[in-house]
Each structure stands twice: as structure tokens, then as C-alpha cells.
Curated annotation (Swiss-Prot):
Molecular function terms from GO: DNA binding; endonuclease activity
Leader sequence residues: none
InterPro entries the UniProt entry points to: DNA_mismatch_repair_MutH (IPR004230), DNA_rep_MutH/RE_typeII_Sau3AI (IPR011337), DNA_rep_MutH/T2_RE_sf (IPR037057), Restrct_endonuc-II-like (IPR011335)
The keyword Hydrolase belongs to this UniProt entry's keyword annotation: yes
UniProt-listed Gene3D superfamilies: DNA mismatch repair MutH/Restriction endonuclease, type II (3.40.600.10)
GO cellular component: cytoplasm
SMART domains given in the database record: MutH (SM00927)
Keywords per UniProt: Cytoplasm, DNA damage, DNA repair, Endonuclease, Hydrolase, Nuclease
Compartments (UniProt record): Cytoplasm
The organism's taxonomic lineage, starting at the top: Bacteria, Pseudomonadati, Pseudomonadota, Gammaproteobacteria, Pasteurellales
Protein's job: Sequence-specific endonuclease that cleaves unmethylated GATC sequences. It is involved in DNA mismatch repair.
Protein name from the UniProt record: DNA mismatch repair protein MutH
Length: 224
């Protein structure tokens, strides 16, 4: 695996993803001349970077899909021995200001989730990082009922944002999506709308997919 140009076709991307399934992180890193860190404490994004490199992902900015020329977003998903997701999945930052006129159809969440290449990875902490395996890829598009559920949650959560109810948002709102603070620390502030319509300093919030929803995606794939 040498110069990794971006895949030109969806089938080529899927073939690349299938070709790395079953490899350990150490084996894949060796092919790419990368060093496996001892753990992820200081390198939280290392696994994502490893998979992106192996597949030739191009997104220069997080605002774009990872394979924007193919209309595909890449998501690694850590799972346990039973294949159940170990964490929620970040989708995109929520527009806390300048969000008038944003609809579900023009939203970043819908754009990012229109087609996703899921790469399950072994994520249990007792498995040394170098020995964890890459799983079988899943190319997914939301069914109409899944999109309806996503849309319902997105619209409910956006209502809180637009109406200046930021302080009322909790991670419990939403069936398949949730809003949570997104940032390395509580000092990273952004602008939002206060309850009287004024501009306030607030924590950046991110949309996350709940584990139950991503578990459903993985389960549906295995049942096919």
C-alpha cells in the first residue's frame, strides 16, 4: 500500500475497505509506515487517521464529507466483543448562531449522514491498541423511517437552539440524536442565542448519534 490517491468510484472505496478488514492496527500501520501509539490517551484521533490514510480520504475540512466527490462520509465505530457500539458517534457541530432558515434538508447533519461508510473496529480497552482488528465495512444510507427519526430529533433540538433555550438542552433529549458539549475543554466558547434573543457566549454543541441507533445499523447489516 503506497501512494494512496482518493478512490475514484464507490466500488473502489468499498474494495479498499474490504481489503483492510481483519488486519490488526499494527499490520495496517506497518503497511502505511505509521507508528502505533501505546494508547489513545494523547492520540484520540489516531484510529480515525489510520483508517482515513488507508482509504485515501480527502476532506481538507471537517465541514466536508470525507469522500465528498463520492458523497460518502467515513465513520469508525468502536465495538465490543458482541459487536455493540462502545460510544456515541459525532456527526457535526450544531449551528448555535446564524441559523435562521436552516431546515433539515439543508442541514449539516443530513448532509453528513446521507451516505456513510462505517468501519467497525475493536474498541475494548483490555485489547492492546496494536492488536485490535479492523472490521468488515458497512456502506449505509438511512431508510425513510431512519431519516424520519433523525429529522424529528434534529428539528426538536434545533427548536431549543433557535428559541434561545440552550440552558434547557440535556443529552437525554432525542431518541436517536443528542446534543452534547463538543470541545477539548470548557474554555472553548462560541456564540449562541440567549433566551431574550441576545448573543451570548456558550459551549460549542455537537450532534451525536446514540449507541442504540448505530447498533441498529450494524444489526441490520448482519441480518442481511
Amino acid at each position: 500500500m503506497t501512494a494512496l490517491t482518493p478512490p475514484q468510484y464507490e466500488a473502489e472505496l468499498l474494495q479498499r475497505a474490504k481489503s483492510i478488514a481483519g488486519l490488526t492496527f499494527a499490520e495496517l500501520a506497518e503497511e502505511l509506515n505509521l507508528v502505533v501509539p501505546p494508547d489513545l490517551k494523547r492520540d484520540k484521533g489516531w484510529v480515525g487517521m489510520l483508517i482515513e490514510t488507508a482509504l485515501g480520504a480527502t476532506a481538507g475540512s471537517k465541514a466536508e464529507q470525507d469522500f465528498s466527490h463520492l458523497g460518502i462520509e467515513l465513520k469508525t465505530i468502536p465495538v465490543n466483543q458482541q459487536g455493540y457500539p462502545l460510544e456515541t458517534t459525532f456527526v457535526s457541530l450544531a449551528p448555535l448562531a446564524q441559523n435562521s432558515g436552516v431546515t433539515w434538508h439543508s442541514s449539516h447533519v443530513r448532509y453528513k449522514l446521507s451516505k456513510v461508510l462505517w468501519i467497525p473496529i475493536e474498541g475494548e480497552r483490555q485489547i492492546p491498541l496494536a492488536e485490535r482488528h479492523v472490521g468488515v465495512p458497512i456502506l449505509w444510507q438511512p431508510s425513510s423511517s431512519q431519516e424520519q427519526r433523525l429529522r424529528q430529533d434534529w428539528e426538536e433540538l434545533m427548536d431549543y437552539i433557535v428559541l434561545g433555550k440552550l440552558t434547557e438542552i440535556t443529552a437525554r433529549i432525542g431518541e436517536v440524536l443528542q446534543l452534547r458539549p463538543k470541545g477539548a475543554n470548557s474554555r472553548a466558547l462560541t456564540k449562541g442565542i440567549g433566551k431574550n434573543g441576545e448573543i451570548i457566549d456558550t459551549l460549542p454543541l455537537g450532534f451525536y448519534l446514540r449507541k442504540e441507533f448505530t447498533a441498529e445499523i450494524l444489526h441490520d447489516f448482519l441480518m442481511d
